[in-house]
């Protein structure tokens, strides 16, 4: 089967191949051509959960996060734990069940289990870990999770069910590096239960012994924290001895973030800082904090250089100016941009995603005006009526008709039609008289009408 060959997972494969690719296709169809002697050409048309551009953004963001985690040279356990902690602390579950891709996870920070497991796969692969995506059932729900290899044994990981996206929640390890016995509520699909699969991926008979971090040592309520400039957050200790308490909090770089004697951190400027807590019994715990600017507080202006955008059936992707306070931001450095379909009259949408020293999302809208009415003509004449017609436009709300009684006269609104009607009969006219008409399309947008340009003047005379 060509498709299964294309998505076959290899331990030395790239992070965008194998299970990652398989978890991101949504549909496909196959066509074949046997017109040539002894040769058949198969053409696969694939539909994916994300676009090529979105996958480029995923690669960029994953590298940025992994660089900040700085575990490339660490042992397998430390790498797996760093990925687990980042994903479970920063990504929320999508209870609307609409977001499924790694893009939704790493960029939108909201996704269902498929996005959790595929992002886990990509990040672990980039760190050189052996990892697979597993599907099956969690209780009665269809579900996706991972297995990863530490030394010579494989362990179960479910970052979806360990996710604790709340300000004061600490990291959960209930589903991290577990054996099958402690993962009994996860029932694998049959292809992951065969003897050949089990032979290729031998599961450890015991869960990883140091997996529950907070049961082993004193720690802070966050092991890593992502903040925006101006944000405030409170640290506190986990697993303190009864006769011990935190004596001091210190920041490795107060220019990036300061911390009070009570553990309250204030984000000052972009950068990375380590917060260290020391107890009276000289126990230490740290949290790595990454501070960025909040892109949602930026301003989008000069869309299309303030030139009116007119419908032409093509997707509109106008230029823009993005500023944060007095600084002009650069696409590809400070933000990436995606556009809505923007093919019809009405409201166009732009979405910016923070990059580099910026994080968050900024949305902007612009107006797409109907195009100029064309194809205007007179289709019927009587002594007291004139019937006009014109070419329909896609996506408009209707058409307005204007009339003048001389070539230099003032045009007056005389009537309108809906978007479904491209004819209009002007009645009660004077016999053997010449009239002049203009037509324009309009689009209702909230409480506003967006008008297209007037058609050419249509001159007509009654009988």
Annotated model-derived regions:
Residues 215-297, 308-310, 314-347, 353-366:
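Extracytoplasmic soluble-region selector
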Residues 50-105:
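Secondary-structure boundary elements
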Residues 400-431:
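Recognizes extended acidic, P/S/T-rich segments that occur
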Residues 153-219:
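His-Asp-centered catalytic microenvironments across diverse enzyme cores
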Residues 426-447:
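Beta-strand-rich modules
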Residues 115-183:
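Hydrophobic/aromatic-rich core segments of domains that either
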Residues 369-395, 431, 447-463:
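Pro/Thr/Ser/Gly-rich low-complexity, intrinsically disordered linker/stalk tracts
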């Amino acid at each position: 089967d060509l498709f299964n060959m294309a998505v076959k997972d290899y331990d030395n494969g790239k992070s965008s191949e194998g299970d990652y690719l398989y978890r991101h296709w949504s549909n496909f169809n196959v066509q074949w051509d046997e017109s040539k002697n002894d040769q058949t050409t198969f053409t696969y048309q694939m539909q994916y959960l994300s676009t090529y551009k979105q996958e480029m953004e995923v690669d960029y963001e994953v590298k940025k996060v992994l660089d900040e985690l700085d575990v490339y040279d660490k042992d397998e356990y430390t790498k797996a734990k760093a990925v687990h902690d980042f994903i479970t602390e920063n990504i929320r579950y999508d209870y609307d069940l609409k977001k499924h891709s790694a893009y939704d996870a790493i960029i939108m920070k909201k996704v269902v289990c498929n996005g959790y497991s595929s992002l886990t796969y990509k990040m672990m692969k980039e760190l050189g870990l052996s990892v697979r995506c597993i599907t099956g059932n969690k209780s009665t729900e269809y579900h996706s999770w991972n297995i990863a290899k530490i030394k010579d044994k494989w362990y179960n990981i479910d970052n979806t069910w360990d996710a604790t996206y709340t300000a004061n929640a600490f990291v959960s390890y209930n589903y991290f590096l577990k054996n099958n016995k402690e993962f009994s509520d996860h029932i694998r699909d049959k292809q992951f239960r065969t003897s050949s699969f089990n032979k290729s991926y031998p599961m450890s008979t015991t869960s990883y012994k140091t997996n529950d971090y907070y049961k082993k040592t004193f720690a802070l309520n966050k092991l890593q924290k992502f903040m925006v400039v101006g944000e405030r957050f409170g640290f506190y200790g986990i697993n303190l001895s009864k006769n011990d308490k935190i004596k001091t909090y210190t920041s490795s770089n107060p220019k990036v973030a300061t911390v009070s004697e009570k553990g309250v951190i204030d984000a000052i400027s972009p950068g990375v800082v380590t917060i260290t807590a020391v107890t009276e019994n000289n126990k230490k715990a740290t949290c790595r904090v990454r501070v960025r600017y909040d892109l949602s507080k930026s301003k989008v202006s000069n869309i299309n250089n303030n030139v009116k955008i007119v419908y032409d059936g093509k997707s509109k992707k106008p230029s823009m100016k993005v500023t944060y306070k007095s600084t002009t931001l650069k696409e590809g450095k400070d933000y990436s941009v995606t556009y809505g379909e923007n093919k019809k009259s009405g409201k166009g949408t732009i979405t910016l995603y923070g990059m580099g020293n910026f994080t968050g999302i900024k949305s902007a809208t612009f107006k797409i005006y109907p195009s100029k009415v064309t194809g205007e003509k007179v289709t019927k004449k009587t002594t007291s009526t004139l019937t006009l017609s014109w070419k329909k436009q896609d996506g408009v709300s209707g058409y307005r008709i204007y009339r003048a009684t001389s070539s230099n006269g003032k045009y007056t609104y005389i009537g309108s039609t809906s978007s479904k009607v491209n004819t209009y009969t002007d009645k009660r006219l004077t016999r053997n008289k010449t009239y002049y008409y203009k037509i324009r399309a309009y689009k209702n947008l909230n409480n506003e009408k967006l008008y297209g340009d007037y058609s050419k003047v249509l001159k007509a005379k009654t009988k």
